[in-house]
Amino acid sequence: MENVPNVYFNPVFIEPTFKHSLLSVYKHRLIVLFEVFVVFILIYVFFRSELNMFFMPKRKIPDPIDRLRRANLACEDDKLMIYGLPWMTTQTSALSINSKPIVYKDCAKLLRSINGSQPVSLNDVLRR
């Protein structure tokens, strides 16, 4: 056999030569501030309308039924009539859902059962 030289490998430990200046407290603060800034921008982009609604004063939305509170119901024969509507000056026939006048056999008796001898307002009927 030939004489083959033996090669021995020894582990080599190399110390890192870079300094750990990247991990200083000052650098971390900048990264944290940048992340917080990005988070605020994302919150603003995705929740802009919600933030505007939160900081704006709430508008009072008028109740559409408030205009009907002064209206009263009355009977003309067997026909139910409404008077006192703000946009109408005369007595008008009350209409059902299918836009036909409401005709009830004992109309006056029905109104007395709702509010006794007092005039029946539309508000009394809507609250029941």
Swiss-Prot record:
Induction: Expressed in the late phase of the viral replicative cycle. One of its GO terms (biological process) is fusion of virus membrane with host plasma membrane. Keywords: Disulfide bond, Fusion of virus membrane with host cell membrane, Fusion of virus membrane with host membrane, Late protein, Membrane, Signal-anchor, Transmembrane, Transmembrane helix, Viral envelope protein, Viral penetration into host cytoplasm, Virion, Virus entry into host cell. GO terms for cellular component: membrane; viral envelope; virion membrane. Residues 52-128 are virion surface. Most cysteines are linked by disulfide bonds. They are created by the viral disulfide bond formation pathway, a poxvirus-specific redox pathway that operates on the cytoplasmic side of the MV membranes. Unglycosylated because produced in viral factories instead of the classic ER -Golgi route. Interacts with OPG086/G3. Component of the entry fusion complex (EFC) composed of OPG053/F9, OPG076/O3, OPG086/G3, OPG094/G9, OPG095/L1, OPG099/L5, OPG107/H2, OPG143/A16, OPG104/J5, OPG147/A21 and OPG155/A28. Except for OPG095/L1 and OPG053/F9, each of the EFC proteins is required for assembly or stability of the complex. This is Entry-fusion complex protein OPG094.
